[in-house]
Amino acid sequence: MNILKLILRLFLKLFFKTKLTYHQQILLNEPSIIIPNHTSFLDAVFVFAYLPNDVCFVINTRIAKKLELPLKLINYVTIDPLSPYSLKKLINLVKSGQSVVIFPEGRISRTGMLMKVYNGIGLIALKTNATLVPIIFTGLKYSKLSRVTDKFKAHFFPQVSMYIGDSFKLDP
């Protein structure tokens, strides 16, 4: 584990009182698609801090332009969600053995609840036979960096739970 992840984990544990729950260790010894819910701008920070180094974050090209500096610290690939070639790019990436993190909702929730899940992840999983690893965050919707601050009282450091679900594969 690199020093940045260690410092980040300590910070998240101390200030957000992070509780990590999982039924099985994420080994990522085969291509996997990690699919967290997206309730805050902090979701990716938590995923980066608690997952192994060899994951690649999938980021919208438009958003990546705004995050140039922090993106230098992680492994990522940009996609244009309106281009059908983006799916082909991701299929080839996963087929090459790379595990990826994709937020299946495509955007941060405005309600704090799960929003529409796009079917591109299912197509990638079927074409690559990749393992799907769900991650559920609770508590981040109460952070100042969520988009639902008008519905809940926002806090700088809400208590956060990160639940890593059992991995599974889709049947063709």
Range-by-range predicted roles:
Residues F46-V47, P70, N92, L123-K127:
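Hydrophobic/aromatic ligand-binding patch that stacks against planar heteroaromatic rings
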Residues K13-T21, P81-L82, K144-R147:
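Short gly/ser/thr-rich secondary-structure transition/capping motifs
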Residues Y22, M113-P172:
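A cross-family acyltransferase "interaction/gating" segment
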Residues K5-H38, K95:
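Helix-to-loop junction immediately C-terminal to a conserved catalytic motif
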Residues P31-I33, S99-F103, V133:
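Residue-level preference for the first positions of well-ordered beta-strands
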Residues L28-S83:
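Catalytic core of membrane glycerolipid acyltransferases/transacylases, capturing the structured
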Residues I7-L8, K72-T78, P104-R107:
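Short, basic, glycine/proline-bearing loop/turn elements
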Residues L93-I121, T128:
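Catalytic-site beta-strand/loop segments enriched in glycine and acidic/polar residues
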